[in-house]
Amino acid sequence: MLDRDVGPTPMYPPSYMEPGIGRHTPYGNQTDYRIFELNKRLQNWTEQDCDNLWWDAFTTEFFEDDAMLTITFCLEDGPKRYTIGRTLIPRYFRSIFEGGATELFYVLKHPKESFHNNFVSLDCDQCTMVTQNGKPMFTQVCVEGRLYLEFMFDDMMRIKTWHFSIRQHREVVPRSILAMHAQDPQMLDQLSKNITRCGLSNSTLNYLRLCVILEPMQELMSRHKTYSLSPRDCLKTCLFQKWQRMVAPPAEPARQAPNKRRKRKMSGGSTMSSGGGNNNNSNSKKKSPASSFALSSQDVMVVGEPTLMGGEFGDEDERLITRLENTQFDAANGIDDEDSFNSSPTMGTNSPWNSKAPSSQQGKNDNPSSQSSQ
């Protein structure tokens, strides 16, 4: 038997699955259920018991220590934007009830939940803040706008960012109240007037205006509470520290060490070509045929490979490229050497290429003999 079968059925939001039905955790890190818990906690508000400690405990349960709450709306004199920190958030919710509200809750339609690295965002374009006002007269105020929340992605799921952008509001008066004062024109005229401005009571608006002064003074208040200094000394200390931050030289960016290029090394072929002939003959048997070609130092080139972001090449990108040309047809490569030419197989004893042309002196000696024979 489930617990819900014993007592009265508790209220759950539409997207929440009741405990015991395929779920082990109370709310499974659902952001909309956190809003449901916030509404349930606000329903426990009573004018006698809810003091500063109660509101501070409420804020600690649902808001992070560095939380920021932002309210934006538009009045007759232009758009307004108020941002308060964690210290001033409890008084904001308390000002709503001090303005005549007896009930406060938020209704979210089609919220969008997104997961990020360390937080979960909830974006609801159709959010309605509903307040039941008992004074100066019974009126229900519906404030429509967009609510954007950021919850820390941990077990507590507390709010770090609260941003409520108000678009419009409606004030609803029950028909029974109108029927009671149907014969009183003065009362009907009073009922036709709005009791809020853009859905916010005068108490809340005055507190938000006061927060414009209180929010920058949070540093002074914290220093006064921590060090027990006088307000004048706190102001002097804060101003001096701010002045130090302003006149401090900007931090120099870390300089990158210049890329050192490697020295070009001479190739082994060029060293061998500059040596004596004896060394060439003795090492010719040990060298491979590919290394027997003479290389000059001008054939060594450094090629820069393209790197990311258009940077220049460095030590890691340098390459030594040796260019090997076919020097067999080079006249300076010793192909005209007589000794190597005579050792060719084509220059054998019986080869017709072996007979040398008669010299000019021998031709002169043969001419007299030929004449005498005649």
UniProtKB/Swiss-Prot annotation:
Molecular function via GO: LIM domain binding; transcription coregulator activity
Gene Ontology CC terms: nucleus; transcription regulator complex
Listed Polar residues bias regions: 341-374
Residues in coiled coil: none
Keyword Nucleus applies: yes
Keyword entries, A-Z: Nucleus
Gene: ldb1a
One Pfam family this sequence matches: LIM_bind
Known function: Binds to the LIM domain of a wide variety of LIM domain-containing transcription factors.
Bias kind Low complexity: ranges: 267-297
Species of the source: Danio rerio
The LIM interaction domain (LID) domain, residue ranges: 299-338
GO terms under biological process: negative regulation of transcription by RNA polymerase II; nervous system development; positive regulation of transcription by RNA polymerase II
Compartment list: Nucleus
Region called Disordered, residue ranges: 1-24, 249-297, 322-374
Tissues/organs with expression: Expressed ubiquitously in the embryo and adult.
Entry superkingdom: Eukaryota
UniProt protein name: LIM domain-binding protein 1-A
Family: Belongs to the LDB family.
